[in-house]
């Protein structure tokens, strides 16, 4: 028999979703306001989407969504429904926020607005990294996930004695390194700052 959730359970879940949403807003703003305008990328499926966007112009949010849709087919079967539900919510919301902020954070010509000025790649990199890292930290600390390498890491962690932080770092290093070799530009690499369970990565 399935027990009926208590009021405290409902409030706890509601709190999780509120903070997950706030974390996603910070993450999406870090990308659209500071990373995309300066063609900087990080690890994760958002980073893969950024590489595709810089190379082809294909919208970052749709690459992110398509990749995660594939990964979620595996996550639903392997990981618990609670993880899958919150991850699905985060994927849809982050896709929306990336799309929305790219519509409004533009210059007079409709191009991504460089908020900290032209040539300020390093400063934009630092600010964007902090916003993205804080956002991801809030999401993870409230039992959420943005999908992508987080899903891969969670699946591996379930069967192998490998910490989430190490697995995510490994995936991020591959993504960021491939970006450098493809474009041969240091600006497209980023010190990936995140919650305490992650390690710093740099290409």
What does each model-found stretch correspond to?
Residues 29, 51, 72-74, 96, ...:
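Alpha-helical transmembrane segments of multipass membrane proteins
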Residues 191-203:
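Single conserved hydrophobic/aromatic residue that forms the stacking wall/gate
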Residues 83-93:
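Cytoplasmic-side transmembrane-helix entry/capping segments in multi-pass membrane proteins
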Residues 1-13:
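Short, Lys/Arg-rich, polar N-terminal cytosolic tail immediately upstream
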Residues 55-65, 121-126:
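Structural signature of hydrophobic alpha-helical transmembrane segments
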Residues 47-57, 150-158:
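Short amphipathic alpha-helical coupling elements at transmembrane boundaries
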Residues 23, 70-82, 142, 154:
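C-terminal ends of transmembrane helices
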Residues 92-104, 121-142, 163-164:
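Mid-bilayer segments of alpha-helical transmembrane spans in multi-pass integral membrane proteins
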């Amino acid at each position: 028999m399935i027990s009926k959730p208590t009021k405290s359970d409902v409030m706890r879940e509601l709190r999780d979703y509120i903070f997950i949403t706030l974390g996603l807003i910070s993450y999406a703003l870090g990308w659209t306001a500071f990373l995309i305008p300066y063609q900087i990328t990080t690890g994760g499926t958002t980073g893969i989407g950024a590489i595709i966007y810089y190379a082809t112009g294909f919208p970052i949010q749709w690459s992110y969504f398509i990749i995660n849709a594939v990964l979620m087919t595996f996550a639903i079967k392997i990981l618990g429904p609670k993880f899958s539900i919150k991850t699905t919510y985060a994927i849809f919301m982050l896709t929306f926020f990336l799309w929305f902020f790219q519509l409004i954070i533009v210059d007079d010509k409709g191009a991504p607005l460089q908020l900290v000025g032209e040539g300020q790649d390093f400063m934009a990199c630092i600010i964007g990294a902090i916003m993205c890292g804080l956002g991801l930290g809030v999401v993870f600390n409230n039992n959420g996930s943005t999908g992508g390498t987080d899903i891969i890491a969670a699946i591996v962690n379930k069967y192998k004695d490998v910490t989430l932080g190490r697995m995510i770092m490994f995936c991020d290093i591959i993504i960021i390194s491939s970006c450098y070799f493809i474009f041969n530009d240091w600006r497209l690499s980023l010190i990936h700052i995140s919650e305490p369970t992650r390690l710093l990565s740099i290409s």
